[in-house]
């Protein structure tokens, strides 16, 4: 299966890739920076159980792993492919990761937020990525209660993500 970063973009050569990221937190748990190890393990287990059938909902196959169980080489490879950042890669707190076979979808559990959904595509495809991110978000929202405030929106670890929890970006040549 071809990975997103192996595709050749001939339609808009200046746009290397697109990314859409959604962050969410669960209502009943403290933010990851305030969550003790035992509760973090419990939450990750609940999220992994809730996500185990995600592939049947979006047609992808996912690999699931705990970051602490990955070899250093695998962590570095996932970091280089921007599945997670260096803070999460080097962190000691319990964390989980799910990656689709084509590596277009990466989901980090208990990183800087409880859930970080990230989608990539070669070229300019923000609308398509947003649609796919929304489907995954809906899937999760049917199974878990998000930390949400009527005035502020989705509550996140960083003030810049409060509200929609959405960040969309493109890498240009």
What residue spans do the PLM features occupy?
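Long, Pro/Ser/Thr-rich low-complexity/intrinsically disordered regulatory tracts in eukaryotic proteins
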Residues: 1-151, 166
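Conserved phosphate/anionic-ligand binding catalytic regions in large, soluble enzymes, centered on
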Residues: 153-170
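Structural signature of FAD isoalloxazine-binding scaffolds in flavoprotein oxidoreductases
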Residues: 173
């Amino acid at each position: 299966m071809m990975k997103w970063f192996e595709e050749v973009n001939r339609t808009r050569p200046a746009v290397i890739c697109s990314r859409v990221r959604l962050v969410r937190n669960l209502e009943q748990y403290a933010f990851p920076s305030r969550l003790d190890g035992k509760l973090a393990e419990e939450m990750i287990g609940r999220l992994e159980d809730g996500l185990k059938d995600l592939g049947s909902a979006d047609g992808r196959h996912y690999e699931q792993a705990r970051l602490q169980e990955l070899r250093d080489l695998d962590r570095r490879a996932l970091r280089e492919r921007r599945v997670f950042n260096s803070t999460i890669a080097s962190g000691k707190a319990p964390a989980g990761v799910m990656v689709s076979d084509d590596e277009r979808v990466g989901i980090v559990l208990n990183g800087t937020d409880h859930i970080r959904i990230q989608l990539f595509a070669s070229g300019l495809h923000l609308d398509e990525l947003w649609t796919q991110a929304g489907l995954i978000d809906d899937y999760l929202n049917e199974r878990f209660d998000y930390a949400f405030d009527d005035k502020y929106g989705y509550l996140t670890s960083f003030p810049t993500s409060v509200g929609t929890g959405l960040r969309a970006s493109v890498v240009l040549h």
